[in-house]
């Protein structure tokens, strides 16, 4: 259904899930946890889709209101996913996707290992896909340039150990 309604969002979600699963496998996460990471990767932006459906019509929102709505998307995604029993673990990952390793993220200001491991993994895969994807206002970066940016974010935005795992996983992804 998502592929028909929002094909770009669906393609992004698939790429994020693929990168996140590869990273989770690189650190030998048990299969049930890899499955949770995959589910959360596929559904990580469901809150954005719900907000866009309710609030973005023919006229696009800009500025502060747009920023406020975007910041709410992880809470909305959590609310949607947490009512489905087999997606509750994914919900707890989705709500933490914009937490930062240094504690300056949102919504709870979690830092370091307080952030669920799945969220730390998906945050990197999500950032990488955003950096490498071309959109209306900019061209996507090369894989190498995007990985340089990911490395720059280690210790502030991202878990340094997961950045190292991402780099190993992305090498494998490029070869496949």
Where in the sequence are the language-model features?
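Histidine- and acidic-residue-rich, metal-dependent catalytic cores
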Residues: 1-176
